[in-house]
Amino acid sequence: MKVYISADIEGIAGISHWDEAAKAHATYQEFRAEMTEEVVAACEGAMAAGATEILIKDAHDTGRNVIASRLPDCARLIRGWSGHPLAMVQELDKSFDALLLVGYHAKAGTEDNPLAHTLNLRIAGLSINGALASEFRLHSYAAGLYGVPVVFISGDKGICAEAAGQVPAITTAAVSEARGASTISIPPRLAQGMIREGVAAALAGDRKRCQVKLPESFVLEVTFNNPIDAYRKAWYPGASQSGPQTVRFVHTDYFEVLRAIRFIM
């Protein structure tokens, strides 16, 4: 079995402040280590279910967070950013049997995580077909392009609820929930156990039930914090400015939407 893991940090156990996600701050090292251990737990669950190949995308900030020496021999790690439109699922293709998402977080414009955002902090929100979109939605649709089922997600309570609403058969592991600028989190060891067991169960189940069906067409709207950014980005071919802070792009091919996001964002 060949499995893809996309890993972020803002949805791991215990995290509650931007300092904990940024290399410049001393507390980052603790949460970098926890991000790594949650990825390792996902690998262990995958191997228990029969995975022999695991590709991991370090998908937080610089893309250089996961401690490679902790990974099993059957894993390969993508570090840094190539600039490819698949972004957080770079190199994903139809050869994979499943996509797992670890440490994912609530979308911009929601109260489910003090670190809620979508892709970066320059935007107030990103919507597809009129609904605010999370990094989960963006990349689960990418998996849908290649027929790869999205079988597991761990992260905050908000993103797990969103994922279950979009893919009812997905296995979720909610490790924290928000109260304003604070979080209530389970202990890291418990989170790692939930991820390990959840991944094993998800991969052993009927993965076809976790296939993501794509809409027939896509209306992308990106709302920037600064109107100057919207003016500049609206010059992308096919895009237009639909408001002082908003850029709009319409297409029937989701890969073209991902390409637009790559250049507009």
What do the predicted segments below correspond to?
Residues S6-A7, K57-D58, L99-G103, I153-S154, ...:
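Short beta-strand segments
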Residues A178, A191-M265:
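C-terminal accessory domains and tails appended to enzymatic cores
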Residues N120-Y146, S154-I159:
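Active-site glycine-rich loop that binds ribose-phosphate moieties when present
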Residues M1-Y4:
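Extreme N-terminal starter segment of soluble prokaryotic enzymes
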Residues S16, V39-K94:
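Glycine-rich nucleotide/cofactor/substrate-binding loop typically near the N-terminus or early
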Residues A142-L203:
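Active-site rim beta-loop-alpha module in soluble metabolic enzymes
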Residues D19-E44:
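Short catalytic helix/loop segments, enriched in acidic residues and glycine
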Residues R79-R122:
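N-terminal glycine-rich phosphate/adenylate-binding segment common to multiple enzyme folds
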